[in-house]
UniProtKB/Swiss-Prot annotation:
Keywords: ATP synthesis, Cell inner membrane, Cell membrane, CF(1), Hydrogen ion transport, Ion transport, Membrane, Transport. Produces ATP from ADP in the presence of a proton gradient across the membrane. The gamma chain is believed to be important in regulating ATPase activity and the flow of protons through the CF(0) complex. It comes from Ruthia magnifica subsp. Calyptogena magnifica. It holds the Pfam family ATP-synt. This is ATP synthase gamma chain. HAMAP family: ATP_synth_gamma_bact (MF_00815). F-type ATPases have 2 components, CF(1) - the catalytic core - and CF(0) - the membrane proton channel. CF(1) has five subunits: alpha(3), beta(3), gamma(1), delta(1), epsilon(1). CF(0) has three main subunits: a, b and c. One of its GO terms (cellular component) is plasma membrane. It comes from the Bacteria. InterPro entries: ATP_synth_F1_ATPase_gsu, ATP_synth_F1_gsu, ATP_synth_F1_gsu_CS.
Length: 287
């Protein structure tokens, strides 16, 4: 029963792996719930600051802001790409990278260059290996990143926009739809796209300190930072939900493999017993 011993060893190994994937599934489920809570808590902030900016921009249309004015000609754009630091989360990163590369190819076909800022080890290694122009890298943020951790990286790209080195800046991440569905998303940050606020015909106004222009300038930067942070925590929620599903699938597959191997083992054992009985019967008949 040398083959039977090998099968038993294989079953034992698969069961040990199954314990690991099952534990990882439970950990991912717990982290996903926390990430969802952070994601839902931050959404109202982005919505409110967007409304305030829309109000200010409409009420004070005499002010000129580069973040709100489109360039006549695109020569170079910037993309902040958000990915996970770790793997074992299904095709989450692969689907996002494929979506980004499709856009990059379209831009390059129009002779538009692309500068990239990567957040997460997976995006960093992938796009560096492709030879694209990576301007800034940020990794090891963990499962509970702080808002301030992103400010330096975002500033690198905004400084490029202010210097007219890039004429458009976007953020790419996985948008959390539900536990099953995560959508690769590329959202334009600047120049800002006009929203519904511009359709309102009547505005009351705020009292500003020190003045409306300075307040709006500060809010525009903070809004961009908030959108990138929102993208980051949504991507973390997507990562944990994808990992939970991937680990559940791995655990289920391990169970199926164990069942199949047990069936093979039992058949081999039955054949060995049958052979032994046949040999005993043959020996007895010979006597």
């Amino acid at each position: 029963m040398a083959a039977g011993k090998e099968i038993r060893t294989q079953i034992s190994s698969i069961k040990n792996t199954q314990k690991i994937t099952s534990a990882m599934e439970m950990v991912a489920a717990s982290k996903m719930k926390k990430a969802q809570d952070r994601m839902l808590a931050s959404r109202p902030y982005c919505e409110k600051i967007s409304n305030v900016i829309g109000h200010l921009a409409y009420a004070h249309s005499e002010f000129e802001y580069s973040y709100m004015n489109s360039s006549e000609k695109l020569q170079r754009i910037g993309v902040i790409i958000i990915s996970s630091d770790r793997g074992l989360c299904g095709g989450l990163n692969t689907n996002l990278f494929r979506h980004i590369l499709k856009q990059v190819v379209e831009y390059q076909a129009k002779s538009i260059e692309v500068d990239i800022c990567t957040i997460g080890k997976k995006a960093t290694s992938f796009f560096k290996n492709l030879g694209l122009n990576v301007k800034s890298v940020l990794t090891d943020l963990g499962d509970t990143p702080h808002f301030d951790d992103l400010l330096g990286t975002i500033k690198v790209m905004l400084d490029e926009f202010d210097a007219d080195e890039i004429q458009q800046l976007s953020v790419a991440y996985n948008k959390f739809e539900n536990i099953i569905t995560q959508t690769p998303t590329i959202m334009q940050l600047v120049p800002m796209v006009a929203g519904e606020s511009n359709n309102i015909n009547h505005y009351w106004d705020y009292i500003y300190e020190p003045d409306a222009q300075e307040v709006l300038s500060a809010l525009l930067v903070r809004y961009i930072e908030a959108l990138v942070y929102q993208g980051l925590i949504e991507n973390i929620a997507c990562e944990q939900s994808s990992r939970m599903i991937a680990m559940k699938s791995a655990t289920d597959n391990a169970s199926d493999m164990v069942k199949e191997l047990k069936l093979i083992y039992n058949k081999a054992r039955q054949a060995a017993i049958t052979q032994e009985i046949s040999e005993i019967v043959s020996g007895a008949a010979a006597v």
